[in-house]
Design a protein with these regions (language model features):
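Divalent metal-coordination and catalytic microenvironments
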Residues: 8, 46, 121
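Divalent-metal (Mg2+/Mn2+/Ca2+)-assisted nucleotide/phosphate chemistry catalytic cores
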Residues: 11, 91-92, 98, 108-221
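N-terminal catalytic cores of NTP/NDP-binding nucleotidyl/phosphoryl-transfer enzymes
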Residues: 22-80, 192-201, 205
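A charged helix-plus-loop insertion that forms the helical arch/lid used to bind
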Residues: 80-96
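Active-site and channel-lining beta-strand-loop segments
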Residues: 220-229
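Single conserved hydrophobic/aromatic residue that forms the stacking wall/gate
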Residues: 228, 233-237
Length: 237
């Protein structure tokens, strides 16, 4: 096992991986780029973001380059994961302010000294805002089936409880998968890291990349509950 994944597990960060053996081989062979997406629904980060930040720092520690994806576009829709009702739709001004604040915070806590591991900051609004709906359905939508989308926890839970799920929210998982595809094409990003509640969305991304370009990409998730971790374990990277 490579040193990155070993420490990832030793620290208790590990929950699931789409193809652990192949990811380990890739990391042993070359330096990679991995990304984590951050929601921009609030002016600042919450305590749950701490583990994700440490994952980015761990990538840097072993010579890999992290990509911070700011969800300026997807925040305009709202992630239904873990929610039993539709999120409040924020104004454009609120989202832009939140995005700038979160980027400022993350630039302070990540290592910017080494140009090889310096974080790359992207905002998915830059590519989502100009999507052509017909082209998107033809090129991307054809790779998703309603049958499978209905099995994901974020959707299934709402429907089982007979709670409404808007068409807007239903599209969130497709857009997140598309984010991974865009980063794979533009930055050669081969890894997405996220909380275990994002597993379905992350798997969608790896599968979309495989179908669209026949390239291999990987997903790695962390526990949503951090009760098994101590603060020094999380923060000492």
């Amino acid at each position: 096992m490579d040193k990155f994944l070993k420490e990832f597990k030793d620290r208790g960060y590990f929950y699931q991986c789409t193809n652990e053996n192949e990811l380990s081989k890739l990391i042993n062979k070359e330096k990679i780029k991995g990304y984590i997406g951050f929601d921009c629904t609030a002016e600042s980060l919450h305590v749950g973001s701490l583990l994700q930040i440490m994952c980015l720092r761990l990538l840097q520690k072993y010579g890999h380059r992290p990509i911070v994806l700011l969800g300026g576009g997807t925040t305009r829709i709202g992630d239904p994961s873990g929610k039993d009702k539709t999120r409040r739709i924020l104004t454009e001004k609120e989202i832009d302010k939140n995005t700038k604040n979160i980027e400022k915070i993350l630039k302070k806590v990540l290592n910017n000294d080494d140009p090889k591991t310096k974080p790359i900051f992207v905002n998915n609004y830059s590519w989502l805002k100009n999507l052509n709906y017909i082209s998107f359905l033809r090129e991307i939508g054809k790779h998703f089936t309603i049958n499978k989308m209905l099995t994901f926890e974020s959707v299934k839970t709402r429907l089982d409880r007979e709670q409404s799920l808007s068409y807007m929210e239903f599209n969130y998982m497709i857009l997140q998968a598309y984010d991974f595809l865009e980063l794979n094409k533009k930055e050669n990003c081969s890894l997405q890291i996220g909380g275990s509640d994002q597993w379905g969305n992350i798997v969608n991304g790896t599968e979309l990349i495989k179908r669209y370009s026949s390239k291999q990409a990987y997903g790695l998730t962390t526990p949503v509950s951090y009760t098994h971790l101590t603060l020094p374990t999380i923060c000492s990277v």
